[in-house]
């Protein structure tokens, strides 16, 4: 349950936004992020987080949204021209791209995504008993589809994003612990989570392949990866790298806001 909460936390951080001071950048981000697929996924993710007694859900449904939009807009504003940014938004707002996005989010929330997380249980048991978990086995997947999924992850700096998010999620460990937990127990929990995060970082591609296999097809991933051929791609990559590089600082602020 704790691991599923953390992944929901990571997935939801940039997906639901409120009204902020408008310009073409903030307007574009809100247009991109407030589609039906995102809204449905966010509702479930925030419901999970609000069940944690020590989490300040008021921050997540209030100031966080403004902070997130302004943070994202700032990086795009700094690294992309208005034309490039507008073209990027148009690419992601294409009906076929939105439909694929819905498939990806559905995979994360579906039984298939839960099965991917359930596959971690033996590894968690090994970590709890001081053992070394075995790496996950990749699912059966068309080689070309696998190549396109891995390329999609690379384009979006997914490994770096997940690493930064996991490091910040560690800051919630103490808040999530039940009352009466001793210092020794907390230390053991922290070590176990360190081990789990390291394991998940190493096996993240396999986890994502497991969740997406059967949910997306080759054409879906080729449609997403067509972004590489767009004139705005170079500035998009620059903005994306800037976001990832600053993510730890932003998530530290989010974690602080989430604490009651």
Over which residues does each language-model region extend?
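Bacterial N-terminal signal peptides that target proteins for export
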Residues: 1-7
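Extended amphipathic alpha-helical interaction segments
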Residues: 115-214
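A cross-kingdom marker for long, charged
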Residues: 194, 198-260
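Boundary at the C-terminal end of the N-terminal hydrophobic targeting segment
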Residues: 20-22
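Extracytoplasmic/secreted envelope proteins and their assembly/folding machinery
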Residues: 26-30, 46, 69, 73-77, ...
